[in-house]
Amino acid sequence: MPEGEMMHKLQDVIDRKLLDSRRIFFSEPVTEKSATEAIKKLWYLELTNPGQPIVFVINSPGGSVDAGFAVWDQIKMISSPLTTVVTGLAASMGSVLSLCAVPGRRFATPHARIMIHQPSIGGTITGQATDLDIHAREILKTKARIIDVYVEATGQSREVIEKAIDRDMWMSANEAMEFGLLDGILFSFNDL
């Protein structure tokens, strides 16, 4: 068997074992494709064994707000209680996803980093003034939605969150826990 094929089969075995143990890994930018893959796994686990705990491991630089909220909504719809574990990085929309766990079940590994900020629009925006105004209003609505998530998750005031996300705010796992983004730091699998 060629080495590439053998490695692919090994990866399939690993992926199957992790899914069977109700572990979902989100280790890439938040895109429609990555969100769809996560949602399919969530649905699979919910349909095969509803109500059983799921561990959602996040290492993501963030990405699409709409794709991220699609995952968020599905997590909130399922009956299975979800634990989040940030390892590496949860930035931007990745940090928002780290907050969708059941209360008391938002964790990070000791060297994880979390970054929160306001939403942005990439690239060049062109169009009529009215269209640009529509886009501006939409991004402000998105910003308000994200602020609502951070306020609810952290218990911080709206003013504190607005100030915190005005620019990129980077935090260690300890700092994120003090800020209210995490419930604990994991040092062992036994802590799950």
Curated annotation (Swiss-Prot):
InterPro entries: ClpP, ClpP/crotonase-like_dom_sf, ClpP/TepA, ClpP_His_AS. SUPFAM superfamilies: ClpP/crotonase (SSF52096). It comes from the Bacteria. GO terms for molecular function: ATP-dependent peptidase activity; ATPase binding; serine-type endopeptidase activity. One of its GO terms (cellular component) is endopeptidase Clp complex. It is found in: Cytoplasm. PROSITE patterns: CLP_PROTEASE_HIS. Its main location: cytoplasm. Keywords: Cytoplasm, Hydrolase, Protease, Serine protease. The keyword Cytoplasm applies. HAMAP family: ClpP. Belongs to the peptidase S14 family. Cleaves peptides in various proteins in a process that requires ATP hydrolysis. Has a chymotrypsin-like activity. Plays a major role in the degradation of misfolded proteins. This is ATP-dependent Clp protease proteolytic subunit 1. The gene is clpP1.
